[in-house]
Amino acid sequence: MAATTAAAAVPGVVRAERLLRGGCVVMAATAALLLGFSAETKTVLFVRKTAVAKDVQALWVLTVAAAAAAGYQFAQLVRCMYCSSSGDAGAMAVAWTSFLLDKGCAYVVFASTAAALQACMVGLIGVEALQWSKLCNIYTRFCEQAAAGMLCSFLAAAGMAVLSAFSARRLFRLYSPAGHRRSCPRAAVLATSPH
């Protein structure tokens, strides 16, 4: 009875992982597109200036990190669909690689989002001690697009943190005796044979 409920739970976990990876692809790609293509041109004191993501280094890093994370999550989504249909999801090297890359991806996206948020707060409220003026009063549309991009990347980072928990669960189940028997038919035969 317990084996049938465990077997029935696995497709639900795989389905949840697929949905979450798909959501992370969409959120990270949306963040990269919003940040990468946001630009606004204004004339201030007879000088025409265009605000783009490259003007704030942290926004540019977030744009690149979100684009890379979207590509990685898409590759993992394809791997998840392929491995669940072929039954090769129990490979130890694949589990370790997925675990480490999922963790790294979540950390990089979260850290770059936090850095971009901190840098953009200067543009939002200014710093009078350093005589940095508020820029979001001038470049309103650019700031709104940057805020939407950072919100999408924060949601993607939260989803990636949950996905790293899925990867950790899959990896550490390979080290449990019950999980090892399910993923390795030879071990199941050796465990049931008399010594």
From Swiss-Prot:
It is a multi-pass membrane protein. Belongs to the Casparian strip membrane proteins (CASP) family. PANTHER family: CASP-LIKE PROTEIN 2C1-RELATED, CASP-LIKE PROTEIN 4A4. It comes from Oryza sativa subsp. japonica. NCBIfam families: A_tha_TIGR01569. This is CASP-like protein 2C2. The chain crosses the membrane at residues 19-39, 58-78, 107-127, 146-166. It is found in: Cell membrane. The keyword Transmembrane applies. The keyword Cell membrane applies. Disulfide bonds: none annotated. Keywords: Cell membrane, Membrane, Transmembrane, Transmembrane helix. GO terms for cellular component: plasma membrane. Residues 1-18, 79-106, 167-195 are cytoplasmic. Pfam families: CASP_dom. Homodimer and heterodimers. Residues 40-57, 128-145 are extracellular. Its main location: membrane.
